[in-house]
Curated annotation (Swiss-Prot):
Entry annotated with the keyword Metal-binding: yes
Required co-factors: Mn(2+)
Superkingdom of this protein's organism: Bacteria
Amino acids binding Mn(2+) 1: D277, D354, E356
Any one GO molecular-function label of the UniProt entry: metalloaminopeptidase activity
EC number: 3.4.11.1, 3.4.11.10
Matches recorded under PANTHER family: CYTOSOL AMINOPEPTIDASE, LEUCINE AMINOPEPTIDASE-RELATED
Cofactor info, note text: Binds 2 manganese ions per subunit.
Residues reported in the UniProt entry to bind Mn(2+) 2: K272, D277, D295, E356
Pfam families (UniProt xref): Peptidase_M17 (PF00883), Peptidase_M17_N (PF02789)
Signal peptide region: none
Gene that produces this protein: pepA
Full protein name: Probable cytosol aminopeptidase
Any one biological process term the GO annotation gives: proteolysis
Top-level taxonomy: Bacteria, Pseudomonadati, Chlorobiota, Chlorobiia, Chlorobiales
Length: 503
């Protein structure tokens, strides 16, 4: 998608689809005059409410309207940045369905939009572009069309090849800044989605590492990949235990972005990289198991976030740590009741092999603290079904030992639309993960599953005072039936916004 900004008057822009955005307030004030000036009948406004993401397509009379087609795009009240992202996603989705390749958006009123949302012009534009990337995303690389008896070009969805934002001359610079940031964040989020959408037979631990290496080459940050022998030498018993049933070796990948000049903060991001989770010996039910290819969503989002930070040039050192393996049953697989020794030296009784994510995260969290001692440690993981029971599929669970850190993450979630809700992390829950034969069990008693998993993880941060765990099991993947099913890339925007705040 070629995205550009222009100050050319709207009436002189040549495009297949002219988009006129309206907030609910603007709709009431001057919508009739705007539409009539552009050559369209204002009668359509009777049914248009300007709700965020609402679209009405107009067809102009030949020689009267400035474009053959126009779209009224609702921005809601315009008081939330997320409304602009939502509207853009709806626009992109509609344009692709209509096979429109050229779109122009009249952003002449962007300064007013920013004022209403108590934000900046750049932030509004960035959110809008992110929404365009979200709505235009398709994962169809594995489709061959071989079974179609007749290939009909009209059936093929066309991508938007050109998107133009029209702005007033005084706002051009800010719009361009927002556009550039939105392209980076949006493309990095879609990169993460591509990784998650790959099936388990096409994405193993080594492929995740290769994706990280390629990202580092593109964006100039260091990537170090530890193979199985090195993982064994480190004594990462959690990662090795999960990998025991697999025919494919594990990897532990470290991405290290070091900005030039003064570093404002050093942040470690840990992403769970289970490429396919069968549950191991504690085998999952077959229904929905195919979606367990998404159990490496945390890893994908960490790669996307590190790349985005590098491309944005933020003055934050960001270290991404990704323990990766699949979790499979076999004659050599770890069994319920086994006791393992983690990288930290803490012993764990494996009460359930389907509670594998916390085992590989345990090693990575300890490694982050011991090797880098960063200012902040944040891990992202599709960790528990219990978090879905508590919060559903649109909100992630947030657990943290630091109130200020939790507040910052919550605020970033509100801005980006990747919302989190803080959950308890009290020591009373430790009783539920006690073991009679080891230091701790990876399986809690019935109830509070997302909380006991978080209490388990906290034992492996080696006393670090600023740590947060984000359970993205719910919002990381959309089941079939959604407007765009599959991976969402949840966490990329959230982390980037958080790191911008700390810059």
């Amino acid at each position: 998608m070629n995205i550009s900004v222009t100050a050319t008057p709207v009436k002189k822009i040549k495009t297949e689809l002219l988009v006129v955005p309206f907030t609910t307030g603007a709709l009431k004030k001057n919508a009739d005059g705007i539409l009539q000036d552009l050559g369209y009948d204002a009668v359509v406004l009777r049914d248009f409410k300007a709700d965020a993401g609402e679209l009405v397509i107009l067809y102009g009379a030949a020689g009267k309207a400035i474009a053959a087609r126009a779209a009224l795009l609702g921005m809601g009240e315009g008081k939330k940045v997320t409304d602009f992202r939502k509207a853009a996603a709806a626009l992109a989705l509609k344009a692709m369905d209509m096979k429109i390749e050229s779109v122009a958006v009249d952003f002449s009123g962007v300064k007013g939009f920013a004022s209403s949302a108590k934000s900046s012009v750049a932030s509004i534009c960035s959110a809008f572009i992110e929404g365009c990337y979200t709505g235009s995303y398709r994962f169809d690389r594995l489709k061959s069309d071989k079974l179609k008896k007749k290939k009909d070009e009209s059936d093929k969805t066309k991508e938007i090849s050109e998107l133009v934002l029209r702005a007033e001359p005084a706002q051009l610079s800010a719009v361009e800044d927002g556009l550039a940031a939105g392209i980076i964040t949006g493309s990095c989020q879609n990169m993460a989605r591509d990784l998650v959408n790959l099936p388990g037979n096409l994405l193993q631990a080594e492929d995740i590492s290769a994706a990280a290496v390629e990202s580092g080459k593109r964006c100039g940050f260091e990537v170090n990949v530890f193979g199985k022998e090195e993982i064994e030498a480190l004594g990462m018993g959690g990662l090795l235990a999960v990998n025991r049933g697999s025919q494919h070796p594990p990897t532990f990948t470290v991405l290290d972005y070091k900005p030039e000049g003064k570093v404002a903060k050093t942040v470690a991001l840990v992403g769970k990289g289970v490429t396919f989770d069968s549950g191991g010996i504690s085998l999952k039910p077959s229904e929905g198991m195919g979606e367990m290819k998404s159990d490496m969503s945390g890893a994908a989002s960490v790669i996307g976030a590190v790349e985005a930070v590098a491309r944005l040039g933020l003055p934050i050192r960001v270290i991404g740590l990704i323990p990766a393996t699949d979790n499979m049953p076999s004659g050599s697989a770890t069994k319920p009741g086994d006791v393992i020794t983690t990288y930290s030296g803490i012993t764990v009784e494996v009460g359930n092999t389907d509670a594998e994510g916390r085992l590989i995260l345990a090693d990575a969290l300890t490694y982050a603290k011991k090797q880098y001692n960063p200012d902040v440690i944040i891990d992202l993981a599709t960790l528990t079904g219990a978090c879905i029971v508590a919060l559903g599929y649109t909100v992630a669970g947030l657990f943290s030992n630091d109130d200020r850190l939790a507040d910052d993450i919550f605020e970033a979630g509100q801005i980006t639309g990747e919302k989190v809700w803080r959950m308890p992390l009290w020591e009373e829950y430790d009783e539920m993960i006690k073991s009679d034969v080891a230091d701790v069990s990876n399986l809690g008693a019935r109830g509070a599953g997302s909380v006991t998993a978080s209490r388990f993880l906290e034992k492996f941060i080696d006393g670090h005072k600023k740590w947060a765990h984000i359970d993205i099991a719910g919002p990381s993947f959309s089941a079939k039936g959604a407007k765009v099913s599959g991976a969402t890339g949840f966490g990329v925007r959230l982390l980037v916004e958080l790191l911008k705040k700390w810059s």
